[in-house]
A protein has these predicted regions:
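Catalytic machinery of carbohydrate-active enzymes
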Residues: 1-327
């Protein structure tokens, strides 16, 4: 989901710089729902279950050609399915430009053979558009501007949160893989330190297991609120926008908070920002192990590999380091 979210600043920047073009973004239905409304950007949600196999993708290409005035295709995904679709468009004589995933460079970074940082993924997307002839400068954020609806307004009112007496800190303690997660005990300690400062704390997550754990941490008397599973996605974004900071792992929440303009303190373990998926314009708030210990990390692109040498990065990242960035 994060890679789709990071197309948003690129798409907005391109249409801002090139008023002559219209963009149709083909993606999954849920992903289409968070693309900002724009007169020259149309997000089309496609259920890929309806287009299985080679013939299914050929059918999809035909339907897209018939329904939309496609004059050019830019593949920002560069996986087998998207390459198959673009091949069908090429057969129709349509120009195709493909995103370079820098697979070799990523492999060298992950295996500790290189420390050369890749450009941010959003800038890589912009480079792809530039290669197609649409050079653009990254426009300033925020890139998503969610409105506060009655559901969120009522929640804030019921919990006496209509005004800020002290900072509002969001915490999104989970990620897609365990090896990227700082740990619930660290989160508990962080919450204790924040509530001692009279800060309000908002806990973000999703899925039954995460919701259950966050509900256990909720303490309304101390202004610790679990919002997991309580709001529609866009209202979660509206709440994120109101925060002073979001503390998170390498996860989609990291990117969405950045897109709404909230400073992000990100904690890194089994992945590395060097491959370009760090929070845009928030590099100064990244928390990592020391330079001397980075080679001890067991890294992967997705953070799905546990330590292979017994080194646990969590032990090195103290609560105090995170607190210092929130002050």
């Amino acid at each position: 989901m994060g890679d789709v979210a990071l197309t948003i600043p690129a798409l907005l920047s391109v249409v801002e710089s090139h008023p002559e073009i219209h963009i149709t973004l083909i993606t999954r239905p849920f992903f289409a729902s968070f693309i900002p409304a724009h007169s020259r950007i149309k997000a089309v949600g496609i259920n890929l279950e309806n287009y299985k196999g080679l013939m299914g993708l050929r059918k999809l290409t035909k339907q897209l050609s018939n329904k939309h005035q496609i004059e050019e295709v830019i593949d920002l995904h560069n996986v087998l399915r998207s390459r198959t679709i673009t091949s069908f468009f090429k057969l129709k004589g349509i120009k195709v430009t493909t995103f370079n995933k820098n697979r070799s460079a990523k492999k060298e970074i992950i295996s500790h053979q290189s420390n050369e940082k890749l450009p941010h993924v959003t800038n890589q997307y912009l480079n792809t558009f530039a290669k197609a002839g649409y050079e653009s400068k990254l426009m300033e954020g925020p890139w998503i501007k969610p409105e506060t609806k009655p559901q969120l307004t009522e929640f804030l009112s019921q919990n006496n949160l209509n005004s800020k007496e002290a900072k509002w800190i969001g915490i999104a303690p989970f990620a897609g893989h365990e090896a990227k997660i700082w740990g619930i005990e660290k989160i508990k300690n962080l919450i204790s330190e924040l509530t001692a400062k009279n800060y309000s704390v908002f806990l973000f997550g999703g899925g039954n297991s995460e919701i259950e754990q966050l509900n256990d941490l909720e303490n309304k008397e101390n202004k610790v609120f679990s919002v997991a599973g309580k709001f529609h996605f866009h209202q979660e974004l509206a709440l994120m926008k109101k925060l002073n900071y979001l503390v998170c792992m390498d996860s989609s929440n990291m990117h969405f908070a950045t897109l709404v303009g909230t400073p992000v303190v990100s904690i890194w373990g089994a992945t590395t920002p060097l491959i370009g998926f760090y929070p845009l314009n928030n590099e100064h708030l990244m928390v990592q192990v020391s330079e001397k210990n980075k080679n001890k990390l067991t890294l992967s692109s997705y953070g799905n590999k546990e330590s292979e040498n017994g080194y646990d990065w969590r032990n090195e990242i103290a609560v105090k380091r995170v607190l210092e960035l929130l002050s």
